[in-house]
Structures are given as structure tokens and as C-alpha cells.
Amino acid sequence: LAGRGQRVVVIERKQYPFHRVCGEYVSHEVLPYLRRLGADPAPLAPASISRFRLSSPAGRVLDSPLDLGGFGVSRYRLDEFLYQLALARGVEFVLPATVAAVTFDAATDRHQVTLADGRHLTARLVLGTYGKRSALDRQLDRPFFGQRSPYVGVKYHLRLAGFPRDVIALHNFRDGYAGISAIEDDRLCFCYLTTRDNLRRSGSVAALEGEVLAQNPHLAAILSSAERLYAQPEVINEISFAPKAPVEQHLLMVGDAAGLITPLCGNGMAMALQGAALVAPLANQFLRGQLPRLALEAAYARAWQQQFGTRLRVGRAVQGLFGGPVLSELVVGALRHWPAGVRALMRQTHGQPF
């Protein structure tokens, strides 16, 4: 939008760079878009990933090539890279700052954005790009916010000699699964999703890993051999996969704020970037007076559902097949003998280059 001559202000509650709970794998479907933006990730020296490995809780393994493949890069490095590019193009940043409320004034056709420190901003258009869950969701009275979610996410960066840098592996355990893949330098991203009950029964993250994750022999080998590069893991709670609306009270939601794909599909970052590619030209038309607000909202909601609706539904269905030890064993066993089924599931949860 800044490249199209629009004034853009980004409000971020942290100071760049910083770590996020994220699998840090990006499908190659995003590369044409990033290159059009002048944001080719090649200078970040990402890992090139072309193979997928899936294991059951007992350790049975399925290997498959990735049709498009992807790259691995930390959010710490990627977000800082995009932040510096945006600054160079005139984007204004207000940080560290937290949005307390966003209201819409129909009389002026403007949004009022209130920050936690009392400052106010006025905007013709607000894009909600704030991730999985925020106090703003409560203020907007979004239905999913009032529904307790059983899921928690944990992330580390690791160093592990001998781990293949072209593989993204997904290892199942009781009531959860863990992903591991290479990022820049000699690092690995290790990120897992499990339930609050699993964590509560174990009493701590360390006990959970030793008692539950390590029942999968592949995870046991990783946890016993890897060097952990954080003093403490990044942890997030209340991860909801419930359907969300892409437009809320005239805010256009993008990325996880619009809908969270289950992490086992490995496509959240690509979906966020594709959401940006969908919203930017429509927002530009609106800001130039070429598209009324209601037409903008309808066009974006329609495009979003067409692009992502099926992916999210398939992701929720696939997640239901994993976590339970017996069902996970059966599914992995069946897919080992049905490689076409594996490729079909991947196509249902990923898009084409854009």
C-alpha cells in the first residue's frame, strides 16, 4: 500500500526484532509475491525444504516429497527484514504500543483507534493483522473469544548435529504433535501443539517433554541430543481453530486474525502473505475512492472464503485424525501405503504460486 502512494501506519506492541511462536516454514507459493514486493528472502539465507516426514506416536514413519517445497527462516530474522523494507518505503511505525479499542464512526466514515497509553489515531481503513488472539477480539465481541480453547503452543530454537536441512518433520505424541525443520544458520525451529490438560497433568514444560513427547522415539532422540538456544521456550495459550469472520465491524482481518489453519498443515505464514496480497489492491481502490466501503468488504470476504475456506475446513478435519494414539497409528499406517493420498491432502491445504 505504501508503494501505491498510501499513508500506512503500523501499530506493534513489541520492538523489532523479537521471537514468535511459529513453525517458521514458508511454502514456496509465496515467492512470486515477495519478489514483486522487492522482498526476496534469499539474502536471509533460509533453509531450502523439499521433503516431509510424518511419524506416529509409536514412531512409525511416512516420508513424502513436497510438491512445491518451501523455505525455513526465523520470524526474528524475517520480520526484521520486512520491517526495515517497510521503513525504507515510508511506512510509519508506532511501537511499542498496544491498541486498546477500535471504533467506527458512520457519520465521518472513519475509524478511531485508541492506544493503551491514551493516544488516538484516525484512519479511513483499519486492517487487523494482530495474530491468533488479542484483547481487541473481546472488544469486537468475536464469538470465538468467549469459547475456551484447549490448545497451547511451545517453541524453541535448537541446534542438532546431523538433522537434514531439507526435511520438515511432524512427530505425533499423545494429544499433540511437534514440528521440526531447519531455519537460517545452523538452527532448527522446534514447535509443538498440545492440550492444556496434557501440560497440567505433567506440571511443567520440561516434565511434559520427558513424560509425553519422549514416548515418540524420534522426539526422544531430538530432546535428548539437541542444544536449546533459548533459556525459556516461547509459549502461547488459548489457540483457537474455530471459524472467524474476515470482516468485523468494518475492520478487514488478515492472517491468523481472519482464520487460523491447524499447524500440522504447515501453511500459516503463506496464508498470511496471500491474505495481504488479496487485501492490498482492494484497499488501494477504496482509498482512491474507486470502491465503496461495503463493496470493499464484500469483495474481500468473498475472495478470502474462496481462497482459504476449504483449506481451513480440511485442516480442522485432518487435525482430528491425529493426537489420539490409536487413530494416529492407523492413519500413518494407511498413508504409508497411499502416497497419492498424502499428496492430495497437501494440495487441499496449500495453494498455488501467486
Where are these regions (language model features)?
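Glycine-rich FAD pyrophosphate-binding loop
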Residues: 2-22
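Short phosphate-binding/catalytic loops that engage adenosine nucleotides
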Residues: 6, 39, 91
